[in-house]
């Protein structure tokens, strides 16, 4: 497994792979890898000849400096996991390598609408940072496919739109959420939970599933469903942050013509902001 930290060396390797006619898959990550990331890697391996995993804690997508400072950097352990998975290339650049003149004056990519709604409204600049780094990685790696987790539902929708709008010839693969046995969605942020909070955390998925059951049973008073869900989260020990029921295809408000809904839930548990989602067919 090659570990590359600089743009010139990465370009050199990508040129070689292209000359050899290899099909390349990219899995962009911020490191602190868990089994959910490994599922992305496995999906990439099944679809391509060569798998490139990027590990970069992107300062442009953090709206709070303290979150950036405390995000775990576990490069050695991450590389060991990826090596066991037989990943071909890890791209692990420094911030200076990606943003040589800092982030303030760096050219950015913005996806209007999707970048400022829902999660984007509570995390200003976050999605602009995501679309900027992902587009840069696409330009550098030139993958045939790229794999992203469906846990970050809005991020996946944003990347799909960016790819369509910018004309990237890249297949975007959404990989289903991987959960612990108790239902908790795997996330790097789960590492912020204390042992006691970890016992409470599966309650998020239980509330999410309860909303889904109500929708599938034909309930359509969304305001009431959301209010009750928020109360249930707070009773379980969470601080409900945002609960939304949206059209799964547009992320706009659910309408009479909506065929699928996505339930998006965000809640604080101690210092960890947990997010999860679930899709529901609207008959």
Curated annotation (Swiss-Prot):
Homodimer. Its main location: cytoplasm. This is Pantothenate synthetase. It comes from Shigella flexneri. The reaction proceeds by a bi uni uni bi ping pong mechanism. The gene is panC. Pathway: Cofactor biosynthesis; (R)-pantothenate biosynthesis; (R)-pantothenate from (R)-pantoate and beta-alanine: step 1/1. It is found in: Cytoplasm. InterPro entries: Cyt_trans-like, Pantoate_ligase, Pantoate_ligase_C, Rossmann-like_a/b/a_fold. GO terms for biological process: pantothenate biosynthetic process.
